[in-house]
């Protein structure tokens, strides 16, 4: 979705979170090969996050998804230290967040990080503008600066003209826009979203997703986005971490996960995904090319870049009975061929990526 930096903004290493009266002692002597159920039976402690490691690049949207109880919200709260991890490290810009003092942590949350929750948490006695400027207010910013910045982000989220209204006068979707604007007003480097749109009606939810994608395209902040909805995950995320029982089952781009689900749990999530919207020509092409395709390639005619999504090629391919050469976006080399039989397979089969290999 974005041209992300290769710089790592957030790095999580071997994060564990146990809930119980003696978690620090238990983790030191814990047999890490035990299942969550076995740990609870042997120690009386509940494992919410189990040995999770991943990195998030600067400027990307990293989605953490899973079913209720999978540990996704607990994990993200460990990243921000709203919950203290039992063991492991969280680094932001190579600074160990788990070793920060309370004052350092407060400074991090005021100046570098913002969070948007499912429940908006707006102050009912404050106007929209005053709610948006709250983070700047506790930071100590002057009133003129707060008003100017709040008006700027108010327009960014599509609420221009509502600055003097109160939260009770706004719809749920509008209130969530205020919550988003409040998070953006402090110019955070990192934005954390905990199922921000799950309580909204489907149409409003889609509007908010599109709004956030536009904002991200403009600002290119590092975003961590929690959801239980796989369709939302593939729409919003540059990378997705899928969680089950406190562990990360698979991390990858939406295309990598849909094309090559690691196990049945991940495959079940991919079941209803419109694969033609996720997969690119390079993922579903045939690597053996016919003479006609080779001839087209030699003439540099009708070549299709390997990174183009099938969704953008449907009209071209379905209306033609010929095969098209698929070329590498970076080098221009011939990689394979694609034709309408592959597109039709993607449109009408559930395990499209697998079945198209045999077309």
Please give the residue ranges for each predicted region:
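A short, proline-enriched helix->beta-strand linker immediately N-terminal to the Walker B motif
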Residues: 185-189
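Conserved ABC ATPase signature
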Residues: 166-170, 174
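Conserved ABC ATPase "signature" C-loop
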Residues: 245-246
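Helix-to-loop junction immediately C-terminal to a conserved catalytic motif
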Residues: 80
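Conserved ABC ATPase "signature" region
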Residues: 28-38, 95-96, 137, 144-161
